[in-house]
Amino acid sequence: MTRYAVLLRGINVGRAHRIAMADLRELLTAEGHAGVATLLQSGNVVLDSDRPAGELVPSVEQALEWRFGFAVPVVVRTREELLAVVAKDPLGSVATDPSRYVVSFSNAPVPAEVQERLAAVDPEDDVYTVDGRELYLWLSLIHI
C-alpha cells in the first residue's frame, strides 16, 4: 500500500460545501482505504491505498459527489512527493517567513497558457515559480 495525502479543494469554507471529517473518514474507509486520518476541518486527509494516484483521484472525487451531493476537486501526493516539494524550496532565498510561503498543487503540470497569464500579472514584490505540478508563491506583503 502507498501512503497518500489527499487534498480536497473548496470544502468547509464559509457555509457552503460543508463536510464533517468523521463522515469523510467513514466514506474513505468504506471505499477500501486504510489508515484514514484527517487534519482539523481542512479536508486534508492521509490514507493508505493499493490504487495508483491516477485512479485514486477520480475514485475519491466520484465517491465524494455521490455521498455529499456536490463536486469536490481532489489533488493527491505521495509522502515522497511532498518531501520532494519541501526539499526543492525554489524560493528559499527570498521566502523568509514560512507563513507567507504558499505551494499550490495540481494533478497535472501547470499548462503553458496559465503560466503565460501569470507572467502577464504584475506581482509587485511577490515572487512565484512554476515547477511541474506545483506553483510556489512567496507573498512579500499581505495585500489589503
Where are these regions (language model features)?
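Short, conserved charged micro-motifs
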Residues: 52-57, 111-115
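Conserved small/polar residues in nucleotide/adenosyl-binding loops
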Residues: 142-144
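Short, charge-patterned binding micro-sites
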Residues: 35-54, 73-88
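Short glycine-/aliphatic-rich beta-strand segments at the starts of folded cytosolic domains
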Residues: 2-15, 101-104
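Short beta-strand-to-loop capping motifs
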Residues: 46-51, 105-107, 139
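Non-DNA-binding regulatory cores of transcription-related proteins
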Residues: 112-126
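Short amphipathic alpha-helix segments
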Residues: 15-30, 112-114
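Helix-adjacent hinge/juxtasegments
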Residues: 58-109
